[in-house]
UniProtKB/Swiss-Prot annotation:
The species this protein was found in: Arabidopsis thaliana (Mouse-ear cress)
Name of the featured protein: Coumaroyl-CoA:anthocyanidin 3-O-glucoside-6''-O-coumaroyltransferase 2
Gene (name only): 3AT2
Family listed: Belongs to the plant acyltransferase family.
Entry EC no(s): 2.3.1.-
Keywords assigned: Acetylation, Acyltransferase, Transferase
A GO term for molecular function: acyltransferase activity, transferring groups other than amino-acyl groups
Function (record text): Involved in the acylation of the 6'' position of the 3-O-glucose residue of anthocyanin. Also able to use flavonol 3-glucosides as the acyl acceptor.
UniProt modified residues of type N-acetylmethionine: 1
Amino acid sequence: MAAQLQPYNIIETCHISPPKGTVASTTLPLTFFDAPWLSLPLADSLFFFSYQNSTESFLQDFVPNLKHSLSITLQHFFPYAGKLIIPPRPDPPYLHYNAGEDSLVFTVAESTETDFDQLKSDSPKDISVLHGVLPKLPPPHVSPEGIQMRPIMAMQVTIFPGAGICIGNSATHVVADGVTFSHFMKYWMSLTKSSGKDPATVLLPSLPIHSCRNIIKDPGEVAAGHLERFWSQNSAKHSSHVTPENMVRATFTLSRKQIDNLKSWVTEQSENQSPVSTFVVTLAFIWVSLIKTLVQDSETEAKDEVFHLMINVDCRNRLKYTQPIPQTYFGNCMAPGIVSVKKHDLLGEKCVMAASDAITARIKDMLSSDLLKTAPRWGQGVRKWVMSHYPTSIAGAPKLGLYDMDFGLGKPCKMEIVHIETGGSIAFSESRDGSNGVEIGIALEKKKMDVFDSLLQKGIKKFAT
């Protein structure tokens, strides 16, 4: 019997680093914003582009430019090419870029049998089908002294001959948040797209700032608590792709008209009659639909049970330091906020309004408070969230502009935030058609996905039409 054909053929695996001599060896400490991500899974994303050319054209015309522009981009975003260093306890982990040694693993692959249109479709598909276009982050190296060195990022570009290209990314979240990642991708994209043009005529995004870490002071041993949990959970365990069984992922889009109708309904039902934002009302609607899906098989009948949703607020330019943290700061700079709603409210007749009011109140509370003073209590809220039934969180945000990634091929025809499959996350982005709608990614068991889809359509009919 002939050997089964593998769906992807690895053409090349190479290492991309900043241009020689452009970046000195650099060590960056982890801040209390970084430490919570030490124990969490990788952040994975995929960008699909239409591309009608052959593999030969792809290798000759597109890949060399992509690699060259990535090298230049890493000159400014060099931590992505570095390592997460984990010394033996009690020394804290840190980021390090070793000039002339460190690099980012870059894989070039070709699809031999996978259907590009099916892979990028919105319809439910087994979560494992996307893993073939995700890069494999190399395993950590451990020195004789017990110092663990973990690669931070890997990239993969895969061609589907005559159909399209997928650019995939895997990275440890401890190095930076979605704001920084979006900044990195847009800088790389701008360089790639401008290849061959006069550099003086190319408008590039602002450069990232690395020097602010020394002013981000821990307001109350916040990082120490996360380090203790990291060490107790076995710091030698390396994050990797773990595929849950019987899971599918699907994408749903709420149009601008549907969102405006949702806003009107919530405003009319709310006691204070205050307008709500697109983000809040969309999140409220999706959270309600998701919880209604999940509780159908729940054994608990307690009406006073409380469900929790974790949101994140960008702290750039919001912290009361003597020097503000700029929008281009490279790193994590997000504050977690827990939204809590009782079961009978979240499943009741005015469920979307209840969720919307709770989310709005939590955001207002966070934006009006001194975030540094509340930071020592963030861990308590997160632990409450973790221990609850069906804890839900968010990945991505429409404001990140993840569909603005034009590498000279036009904007993506699809974008996926893959790591939502690890459980309980809702992926958010702007709609790809530019109509100011919102795109939502969900991962569930197949049976539950059918229920979610049905509830979502019923909700749209009730609240948004």
